[in-house]
């Protein structure tokens, strides 16, 4: 996974010197454990062909024919749907793959880099998938859902298990429970150790923070889902986007806030199916 090369211009000078890893997309799970085989049936693996169909990002099945992911996963170098494949929920990467083709990639038009927000994209599968007990969609939240600070949610993926420590074979799906961190508090945390003025918002309104020291997403599953259980229903609160390091003090993981983009999502994805 490539590093994001640019930072938001007002933050550039302070962040490059104080936190050189801030531009890393989020790609895996730290402080978690292997997920049991019947959990997270909406989790998908995005693949790109590099001598083999290699996992590079995560995503979530939100409709039998649509996958939600991060825009930075499908930037200009991966914009051709013919060069992508989707693997539905499986316990171990690369074991008996059944890869699905993609007919359309739709990145949010406001996306430039993850730190500027709008880090969200949709993939339309060539054919709808069969919904089963092992593979089914995750519900999107109502626009009124705020996911208050302290709410315990889960993030899943196949990425690194610590800074620069890859997930070892057989590459099981990992999960970790993370608390929601209120945006203003998260923004204050990200200002610690930086010379950036308090009037410069690092954490934008379209973002959501979750995680604490030792429990976080990391560097293989950007685009994956952050889900929270609300009244016995799993709702996708966020899309794994970016952060500084993995599970570092005062640096929660930053996610795209799904409720902020519901109107945009439903412009393409049928709400009822």
UniProtKB/Swiss-Prot annotation:
The active site is at 72 (charge relay system), 119 (charge relay system), 222 (charge relay system). Disulfide bonds join 57-73, 153-228, 186-209, 218-246. One of its GO terms (molecular function) is serine-type endopeptidase activity. Its main location: secreted. It holds the Pfam family Trypsin. The keyword Protease applies. Residues 19-28 form a propeptide. Glycans are attached at residue 49. Its EC number is 3.4.21.59. It is found in: Secreted. Keywords: Disulfide bond, Glycoprotein, Hydrolase, Protease, Secreted, Serine protease, Signal, Zymogen. SUPFAM superfamilies: Trypsin-like serine proteases. Glycosylated. It comes from the Eukaryota. Residues 1-18 form the signal peptide. GO terms for biological process: extracellular matrix disassembly; proteolysis. It catalyses: Preferential cleavage: Arg-|-Xaa, Lys-|-Xaa, but with more restricted specificity than trypsin. One of its GO terms (cellular component) is mast cell granule. InterPro entries: Peptidase_S1_PA, Peptidase_S1_PA_chymotrypsin, Peptidase_S1A, Trypsin_dom, TRYPSIN_HIS, TRYPSIN_SER. Belongs to the peptidase S1 family. Tryptase subfamily. Tryptase is the major neutral protease present in mast cells and is secreted upon the coupled activation-degranulation response of this cell type. May play a role in innate immunity. This is Tryptase. It comes from Rattus norvegicus.
């Amino acid at each position: 996974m490539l590093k994001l090369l640019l930072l938001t211009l007002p933050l550039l000078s302070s962040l490059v010197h104080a936190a050189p890893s801030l531009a890393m997309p989020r790609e895996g799970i730290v402080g978690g454990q292997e997920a049991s085989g019947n959990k997270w049936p909406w989790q998908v693996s995005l693949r790109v062909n590099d001598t083999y169909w290699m996992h590079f990002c995560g995503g979530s099945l939100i409709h039998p024919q649509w996958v939600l992911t991060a825009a930075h996963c499908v930037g200009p170098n991966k914009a051709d749907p013919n060069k992508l494949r989707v693997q539905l929920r499986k316990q171990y990467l690369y074991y008996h793959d059944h890869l699905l083709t993609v007919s359309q990639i739709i990145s949010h038009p406001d996306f430039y880099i993850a730190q500027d927000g709008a880090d969200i994209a949709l993939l339309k599968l060539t054919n709808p998938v069969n919904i089963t007990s092992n593979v089914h969609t995750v519900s999107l939240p109502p626009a009124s859902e705020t996911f208050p600070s302290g709410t315990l949610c889960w993030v899943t993926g196949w990425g690194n298990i610590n800074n620069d420590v890859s997930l070892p074979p057989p590459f099981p799906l990992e999960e970790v429970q993370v608390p929601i961190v209120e945006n203003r508090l998260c923004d204050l945390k990200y200002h610690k150790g930086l010379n950036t003025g308090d009037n410069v918002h690092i954490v934008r309104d379209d973002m959501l923070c979750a995680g604490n020291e030792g429990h976080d997403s990391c560097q293989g599953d950007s685009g994956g889902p952050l889900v929270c259980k609300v009244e016995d229903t799993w709702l996708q609160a966020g899309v794994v986007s970016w952060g500084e390091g993995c599970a570092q003090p005062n640096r929660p993981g930053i996610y795209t806030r799904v409720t902020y983009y519901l109107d945009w999502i439903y412009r393409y994805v049928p709400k009822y199916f």
